[in-house]
Every structure is written in structure tokens, then in C-alpha cells.
Regions:
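ATP-dependent carboxylate-amine ligase
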Residues: 1-113
Length: 113
């Protein structure tokens, strides 16, 4: 499906995620880079956002389109800026961090509630 969308990569390296993030170099992000024309925004966040942005650069993403967003509140603003669907690819703890931020603004409860 070639529908336009936003894509967000959230990379943490906390204990529950695994502190070794070298696995990002084994993932075929090049396949996504070949489809990058359909991404209206390429968002990167998380504790290791800079490492993720670097990996996307080497995968062939246009670095001028990669947006590193340091906090989840601003990330949610970017995601909600329009009605374009967003695909979020988080590591384990990033998923819970983002869900916690979402719970501040919606009826969705934080995972532990």
C-alpha cells in the first residue's frame, strides 16, 4: 500500500530494551528508505534518537527529512499535527513512555493503571 503516512522510530537502550543497540545495524531499514517518498514526516525520538537518526541516514533516508524530537509531548504534537496515519515503531520501554504521555491527554490509561 502506497498511502501517505508519517513514521516514527522510538529507540531506547534501557535494561528492559537491551542496552546493546547494535541490532539496529542488522535491521533492513534500507527497504523502508526505498519507500520513503510516501512518508510525509520521518520522526525519531527516544533515549537513543541520535543513533536511530544516524542509522536511517546510512539506510538512505534523506537526512533533511529526519526530525529528531527529544520529548514525547512534542512528538505527540507532531503526530497529531494532521490526520495522516502514523506508524510508530518503538522499543519496549519507549512504548510505555509514549503510552504514559498519551494517557495525559486522552482517556487511555497508563499501562500500569
Amino acid at each position: 500500500d502506497e498511502e501517505e503516512c508519517k513514521i516514527a522510530f522510538l529507540l531506547n537502550d534501557r535494561y528492559a530494551d537491551g542496552t546493546d543497540i547494535s541490532w539496529i545495524w542488522d535491521v533492513d531499514f534500507e527497504a523502508l528508505a526505498r519507500q520513503s517518498a510516501r512518508f510525509t514526516r520521518i520522526l525519531v525520538s527516544g533515549v537513543r534518537a541520535d543513533d536511530m537518526a544516524l542509522r536511517l541516514k546510512y539506510a538512505g533516508f534523506d537526512t533533511g527529512r529526519i526530525e529528531v524530537i527529544r520529548d514525547y509531548e512534542n512528538l505527540l504534537e507532531a503526530i497529531g499535527a494532521d490526520e495522516t496515519p502514523t506508524f510508530i515503531m518503538p522499543t519496549y520501554t519507549a512504548m510505555f513512555d509514549l503510552r504514559g504521555e498519551i494517557s495525559k491527554h486522552t482517556d487511555i490509561k497508563a499501562f500500569y493503571e
